[in-house]
Amino acid sequence: VSQQESDGYRDHSSYLNKSLFFKHAREFQNINLKFNLLYFDSPYAFDPGGLTIELVDENRSQARDRNVLYNSQESVKQLQTGLVLNWNTKIGQVNSNIYYSNRDFIGLLPFTYGGYVELNRDFSGAEFSLKNRSESFEWMIGTSIQNQADDRKRFENNEGEKGVKVLDQIESFKSLGAFALGSFNKSKYSIQAGLRYDIHEISSDDYMLDIGIDQQYIDYSKSMSAFSPSLGLVYSLSKNRELYINYGYAYETPSLSELSANPNGTGFNENLSPMSSSGFDLGFRKQSQDLSYSLTAFYIDTKDEIVRYELEGFEGMNFYRNLGTSKRLGAELEASYNLGKPGVLNASYTQAKYEFENQGISGDLAGIPKSNFSLEWLYAYKNLDLNLDLKYVNSLFADNNNEVKVPSYLLSNIALKNKVNFKGVSLDIGLHIRNLFDEKYYDNIRANAFGNRFYEPASLRQFILSIKTSF
């Protein structure tokens, strides 16, 4: 059971979150069963909106005036449950997973037409797999099915009051997939290969109200399918040192929320296409009792990347379009060192280029820093846990035209937790200090926002008391 409540750093940014999580596991002779249940309730989370840099310099804690006028906020209620069942057979181990979630969402956006949103989402699915291994070969085959149904309505937002309905549509996303994985293992090397095939069916039943005349019915349906192969090689240099190389191809369909954000009005945005990516990574890793680290170089080539943008008169609402081709080329370093009694140090560093080309125009992808660094110290003594982290994020561009640059920042947080048990009830009491050095930075950049309202200033130094219980 948990509850989070805050007045927010900025005006019009308070929120309340409540959640209940239940987990139960049972073991039988050849069967393992796990059941999870999560209920989440956020009655309100106000949105202060994005600011121009001039407004940030004037008062970084202020909210955008239109967000206050239209009472921009959202409320969410979500129920999520799942059942995992694993058992052994003569031909291998069967793993199954069945899940369901329901989400009720109400959102108020800072404009009139369509600015009051009601969404009810049902999401369900199942996955089944069979795996086995011999002395030198491992394999897995499986299938998955998913179904998402969104009942989406939009109304006029009359300065925080619900107005007339302007959109009413039922959206559906169905997916059926099959996959196979194999690994051929020898003492010095391992060859891994995989193949997945997915079929997607996306549809929309749109009831668009024709004011003063009648009701108009619009139907949209589209099928998509694709193969996603992968291939990898791991070569052992010694007992704890490995070289590895991987190739993979994947594609991603637009989500229902992205498709329904149609700049031409109701219905789906038929100009929005799936994005596809192919990539390589080459790396080295070493593991020992006290030190482990990995160094990876990567290259990803993406076609029809889906990016967000805003339109005049609909500021605060995300629209989406495909952005030609993009390339990601870089390197990542991760390391973990066991200090013994003083704890554990974890560190990571990324340096990369994220570039795009669209209709003869090229530049850096908006909203992605070229480099970042993080350092974390974990210390534990009896029931006391201490976590100190430091993160550096390089500068980035806020727009695809690369005209507005957001400065870099250095952020540090500290968390102290103590666990107390009382009559079978476990209490985790914590003190968190966020932004320890009082850094002025932005916790979100609204890439390609209209009117240069890119900036959502983050809180300065903040003290948080938390109490968590489980039983």
Where do the protein language model's features map onto the residues?
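Outer-membrane beta-barrel signature, preferentially recognizing the C-terminal barrel domain
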Residues: E58-V84, L167-S175, I218-S228, G232, ...
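C-terminal beta-signal and adjacent terminal beta-strands/loops
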Residues: F298-K303, G340-K341, L345, S395-F397, ...
